[in-house]
Amino acid sequence: RLSYFLWSSMPDEALMKLARAGKLSNPAELRRQTERMLKNPKAAAFGRHFPERWLKLHELGRMEPDKRGPYGHYFRVKEYLVPQVDAFFSDLLETNGPIRNFIDSDYTFMNKMLGELIYKQKVVGEHLRKVKLEDTRRGGLLTMPAVMTVTANGVDTSPIVRGVYVLENILGTPPPQPPPDVEPLSPDLRGVKTLKEQLAIHRNQEACRSCHQKIDPMGYALES
């Protein structure tokens, strides 16, 4: 299982020998083998497959924006979105960087197209490279365009969807399913102008309050 998890292929002879001897049940030996395997070129598969499954990047393209709409630039950067996440994850793994960089880093990986259309920074060439961010609010995984796109519907964004995404995929504390008798939003929205105001009304409903007090702040943080 360790080999297929890290290499997406069969174990080598060294790992087989240790497994037959029952030595992989020893935490120290397991750690040694994990570190050894991550240095092997085969571990590049882990650098691709793990973040893509973890962050649900297979859902990219499920609801693409209108090419003529305000998010039409998506189609010019689409091919770089998943590779950007993979490059960031693999670099953090290879350098044994601090885990907080997943959430807050002062750098990212970009090329000319991503720099021009997403980050508003000048970068030369098509190759993704490690670049210090001029706006550090764009650091980490959560603000990468791949994640922003996965948590949108092609027309607009949703703080609820993004809040649930953070709770499920980053914090590992998914909220329970909403009660079956709760409407998506309160029918009485007179005088309400913004989505934030609509959701505030929703949170005032007793059946919604406990979950949305956790969901909504997470989602709002990704809306600015």
Residue ranges of model-derived segments:
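Sequence context surrounding c-type heme c attachment/ligation sites in exported
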Residues: G115, K130-S224
